[in-house]
């Protein structure tokens, strides 16, 4: 379940979770995969000392966000994030708090599509994007045997159940919690994602992306690979494909410090002494 419920300016209720340092001046939005809800922190030891405020909003049908919140397109989810960012900026300005500048965005799997759509549709709100294992729109494959019905298991994320990286302290529990939260409304979230993924019109806007984009792919993954990254690279002038030699779907975890170095290079304006406590 999300840590909080918020109401967007449109009146739509959305589940909201956060991690990292709330004092940081750097906001990073994390767009989760299919299935995924709540908050997944790839490496809390890195996040907590980096100087970043990590935020995730649940898509309709996942966790605490009801079905029927806004439309069903990738663009609608991007616009939800834009509304959240704009409202957060306005609230900080009116309260005299530090006003966030443009945000960094991380997208995992299908969440990468939402991240790129946000950067295309609202370039003034986003300056850096990192997407991980995001398929090209025409290359996405939805596996009903793994992703349609809960309970969801690791293979739904492309992670073998016996992957040795799952033995990292707390990692399996954090992933299982994300999957359990994704199933709180049954298959409503994955059904909404399937509707969104059936429409590829969002990809026609990719040329409008101005943010500095990294497209990250693990060499030991077969169904989504650097060829998907090349598809995006041809459409996004500011993008670069980054290959990771190993780690599979969990390269997101092993490369988390490098990902944060891209989306939050200045450590949220916090000194090393402050970040290390």
Task: List the model feature ranges, each with a label.
Residues 12-66:
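Conserved HGGG/HGGXW glycine-rich cap/lid loop of the alpha/beta-hydrolase fold
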Residues 76-103:
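Conserved acidic catalytic loop of the alpha/beta-hydrolase fold
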Residues 107-111, 115:
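Gly/Ala-rich beta-loop-alpha elbow adjacent to hydrolase catalytic centers
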Residues 129-155:
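Flexible "cap/lid" loop of the alpha/beta hydrolase fold
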Residues 149-204, 214:
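Alpha/beta-hydrolase
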Residues 209, 215-217:
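Short beta-strand/loop motif that positions the catalytic acidic residue
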Residues 222-228:
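Conserved alpha/beta-hydrolase "acid-adjacent" motif
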Residues 238-277:
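Catalytic active-site module of serine/aspartate enzymes centered on a nucleophile-bearing elbow/loop
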């Amino acid at each position: 379940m999300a840590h909080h419920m918020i109401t967007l300016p449109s009146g739509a209720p959305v589940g909201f979770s956060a991690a990292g340092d709330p004092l940081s001046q750097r906001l990073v939005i994390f767009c989760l995969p299919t299935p995924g809800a709540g908050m997944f922190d790839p490496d809390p030891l890195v996040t907590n000392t980096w100087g970043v405020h990590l935020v995730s909003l649940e898509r309709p049908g996942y966790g605490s966000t009801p079905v029927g919140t806004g439309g069903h397109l990738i663009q609608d989810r991007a616009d939800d994030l834009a509304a959240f960012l704009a409202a957060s900026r306005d609230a900080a300005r009116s309260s005299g708090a530090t006003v966030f500048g443009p945000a960094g965005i991380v997208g995992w799997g299908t969440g990468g599509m939402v991240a790129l759509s946000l950067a295309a549709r609202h370039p003034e709100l986003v300056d850096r994007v990192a997407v991980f294992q995001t398929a090209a729109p025409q290359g996405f494959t939805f596996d009903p045997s793994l992703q349609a019905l809960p309970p969801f298991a690791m293979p739904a994320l492309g992670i073998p159940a016996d992957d040795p990286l799952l033995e990292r302290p707390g990692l399996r529990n954090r992933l299982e919690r994300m999957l359990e939260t994704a199933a709180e409304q049954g298959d409503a979230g994955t059904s909404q994602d399937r509707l969104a993924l059936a429409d590829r019109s969002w990809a026609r806007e990719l040329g409008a992306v101005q943010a500095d984009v990294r497209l990250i792919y693990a060499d030991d993954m077969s169904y989504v690979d650097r060829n998907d990254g090349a598809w995006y690279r041809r459409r996004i002038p500011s993008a670069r494909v980054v290959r990771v030699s190993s780690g599979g779907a969990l390269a997101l975890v092993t490369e988390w410090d490098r990902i944060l170095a891209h989306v939050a290079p200045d450590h949220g304006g916090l000194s090393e002494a402050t970040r290390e406590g």
